[in-house]
Amino acid sequence: MASSDTTTERKKLADLRVIDLKTELKRRSLDVNGVKNVLMSRLKQAIEEEGGDPDNIELTVNSDTPKKNSKNKGRKVEADESGCEASVEEDSGKDNELESQDVSDQDGNDELKDSEENEEESATFVNVLSTEEENETKQTSHFDNPERGSDIQAEEAEEDEKKDVTGSGDVTQEISKPLHSGDNESELRIKEEMETSTSLKEAEDDNVSVTIQAEDAITLDCDGDDLLETGKNVKIADSETSKPKDEQEASYPKDGLEDQKDLTSENQKDDKEESGKGDAVKKDGREASKKTESGDKDKDSQKKGASSTGASGQAKSSSKDAKESKSASKEDKGSTSSTSGSSTRNLWVSGLSSNTKAADLKNLFGKYGKVLSAKVVTNARSPGAKCYGIVTMSSSADVARCISHLHRTELHGQQISVEKVKNDPSKRDIKKDGDEKLGSGRTSGERKSSGGDKNSKTQSSVKKDDRRSSDKAEKKDGKELKKDSKEKSESATTVPSPESSKKNEERKKPGGKSPGPMVVIDQTKGDQVYGRPPIRRGRFDKMRNREPFFQNKMKFREFRDRKDILTFEKMKQQRIREKVERMERIQRFRRAVEMRRSREMAERECRERERIRIMREREELDRLQRERERLEIERQKLERERMERERLERERIRIEQERRREAERIAREREELRRQQEQLRFEQEKRNSLKRPRDVDHRRDEPFWNENKKMAVDTDSRFSHGSDFNRQQNRFNDFDHRDRNRYSEGSNVSSFERRDRFVSPGEGKKGRPTMENFNKNFTDSRRNEPAQPRNDPRDTDRREVRDQDDRRPVGIERTGGNRNDGASHDRGRLGNPEIQHGRQRDSGNNQARSGTWKGEGGISADKREARGERTDRPTRESTGQPSRGGHASRGGKPGYTSRDGDRSVIVGERGSSGQHFNEGRQVVERHGRDAGGPRKDWHAPSSQGSGYNARRMSDGRSGGMMSSNPAINRVVQMPGGSMQRGSGSGFKSYKGAPQRRY
């Protein structure tokens, strides 16, 4: 290292590499653990505290080292790329082979997987520990050679940088160690000094170099498959082959501590033997080193060519590095203290998560001590399934501290187990040359039979190297066997026939693993577990068919057999427990599913019941609503009916009231009409009591009128009709205009009963004067009203006639009275209750006036007054009976026919002659007086009296009366015997009434 030049450079802090950062931190006695960012921040803080500029840092750089490192890095990258491509192709082919061969049942697969994982862990651990040995040898060489301390520290820093950069992933994160810097002369000089201490084992350096080269390829997961396919017998040194035992002990920590103690004592015993043996052969080793110095250079060149044709171009640097590291480790392995120290500084970490990095382990274990190296390995067949870590601490105290603090703790969500790796890297066992050749031949044959297409160039180059290494190893083995007869006899007794013993071992245990100092990883190792064929040939199958070569093989095989038996039982129990737990989990899951399903069904049923209940409630509410609506409609209907009934009741009451008022009104009108008719009758009677005027009617031409008009007539028979007025009293008091047939029969009876007293008026009446039959006070009822003067020519004529006929007999008045009987019939039959008939006519006034009535004008004046009074009310009485006209001429004729009962009379003839009087007159027109006179002013219209009375009289008249129809000019035969006397008044004839005499 003295020849190397050192220069000073100025760089920025961000441009520094990890190795530069660690160098600066070590120079300042600071912690170098952590990733690049942590180191940069730590260095920046230190520079700022010193007052320096972080952007301008002075670095002491070796001029040769960067070039060498960059060259080596380039070679490694190229090797990685080429090797990775080859490994990817091989992996794809092996995956297809696995899929085609995977036909075993599930339990077999589980067992095979467990066994293969154990094998893979052991193979991986072999590779990992080989690299750890390199670190240890570098450290020991650093302690022995202080002048190379700085270079070794730089290499360690560069190694950490590569771990941080290329990284710590889920795959095996093994980084090959950087080469030592320096030229070839310095390397040769150092090599000579190192080889003086190793006399016997110089011949094995070639094998070690090849082993390291293959191991680097395996750990980088790049060209291991190429080396595997060549059928090369890859041999691993004793320090590497002794570690699968410890790895298996670490992977099976449950196997017990007794086996580990036996193995540890066995390793210690072998260490002592090897240490003594190493001291004995130092001198011979120095001489042999001088002789083989030139041969080593040739071998170096040959190794470079083989590595370039076989796997990659990094074989040159790795072989040189391996030689130096192995020579340093061989020199250090002479002492027991260093061996025991290195064996106890390694920690095995299991249970890591797939995303754990080596930097995480380094940071975690760095809290409890100084970490020399930290690596993460994984199962290459199933990346990410299981990850393990290997941590090398600086001292045993740090190891104990880490175990006590970190065992059974959690990292990245996974529980990790930290255990001490118990191994002996200085243990070496020697095997004979025949065993090597046999193992190599068998291995190559098996590789050819199983592999198919192999790389012939790689095979040939590796075979040449194997032959040279085996020849040299055979020579050195001969020397070693001469010096140590004890070991030779032991090995001879242990292995009397290597080929036969190997065959027996394969027959007894076809899948058994044959551990030893020179571990031969056979391909049939896949059959280790329970005799099943291998499922997949992974990249760790490359070292399987190797012959075991160590002196205590039988003892260790017995130990392995016992261990395998225990492991099988435990694995069986473990599988039974796992199966029971799996069944319990399945049962719990099924129960949970069933409970959840039943709960869901119950909830569904509950929801269904609730839905049905809500639906029923809704239906019930709808039904109740409809019922309420129906009841409301019924109530409204009943209310309408009630209101209709009330309305009808009110209407009925109103109609009854109207009817009652109408009846009262009609009764009042009837009463008024009755009074008027009574008054008219009285006036007519008063007028008839005077001299009857000359009748100018056309009936004068008839022979009836030409008879003697002064015929002697009985006064009683003359005035017997006066009794007819008595029937008018109270005749219409109980009349109802709605029932016109009510008095059809009863009226006759009542009138008959009222007139019984007038049947025989008595003899006293016959001698009385005529005017005494009249009531002399009938004109006094209207005296209070002023008399209206009248200029009626007929009255004048009447007075003149009466004056001329002073001595006219009373028969004339009788005749006139008979005429007026029809008038009384037409005027109305209502009797005035105020007028008393009968014997009131026989008052003294009438007797006093009986002699002088013709010559006086008082009576005519009274009649004029009475007539004047009647002119006031023609309209009122005419409105009450609008349909009662046209019958004035009906009742007049029988008054004349009663005089001659044997004569047929033309009824209505006079009515036909007096038709022009019908619109204005009721009674007076019958007399045939002048038409159009003023008398119709004071008479009620013909529609009142005559029509009304005709209707009232039409029902009960059976003899000589006509029907109520206004049939004028009707000719009726009236037989003489059909009408009695006294019927001329227009009323029915009464039984027992005396016939009128003329």
From Swiss-Prot:
Cellular component terms per the entry's GO annotation: nucleus
What cystine linkages occur within this chain?
A: none
Q: Where is the composition biased (Basic and acidic residues)?
A: 136-150, 180-194, 235-248, 255-303, 318-334, 419-490, 500-509, 683-721, 733-743, 752-766, 779-811, 861-876, 918-939
Localization, UniProt? Nucleus
In this chain, composition skew of type Acidic residues spans 80-90, 98-122
Keywords in UniProt for this one? Coiled coil, Nucleus, Repressor, RNA-binding, Transcription, Transcription regulation
Q: Which residues form the SAP domain?
A: 13-47
> Positions of the region Disordered?
48-208, 233-348, 417-546, 683-998
Where the record annotates domain RRM, the positions are 345-423
- Per its UniProt entry, which superkingdom is the organism in? Eukaryota
The protein's matches in Pfam families, at most eight in alphabetical order, are given as: RRM_1, SAP
Kindly give the Gene3D superfamilies that the UniProt entry links to this protein: 3.30.70.330, SAP domain
Q: Its GO biological process terms? A: regulation of mRNA processing; regulation of transcription by RNA polymerase II
Q: Listed GO molecular functions?
A: RNA binding; sequence-specific DNA binding
**Which residues lie in Low complexity bias regions?**
335-344
InterPro entries registered for this protein in UniProt:
Nucleotide-bd_a/b_plait_sf, RBD_domain_sf, RRM_dom, SAF_Modulators, SAP_dom, SAP_dom_sf
The residue stretches assigned to a coiled coil in this entry are 590-692
For this protein, the record's PANTHER family field holds: SAFB-LIKE TRANSCRIPTION MODULATOR (PTHR15683:SF5), SCAFFOLD ATTACHMENT FACTOR B-RELATED (PTHR15683)
Q: What does this protein do?
A: May act as a general inhibitor of transcription.
Protein's recorded name: SAFB-like transcription modulator
Q: Which organism's genome codes for this protein? A: Xenopus laevis (African clawed frog)
Query: What taxonomic classification does the UniProt entry list for its organism?
Result: Eukaryota, Metazoa, Chordata, Craniata, Vertebrata
Gene name linked to the record: sltm
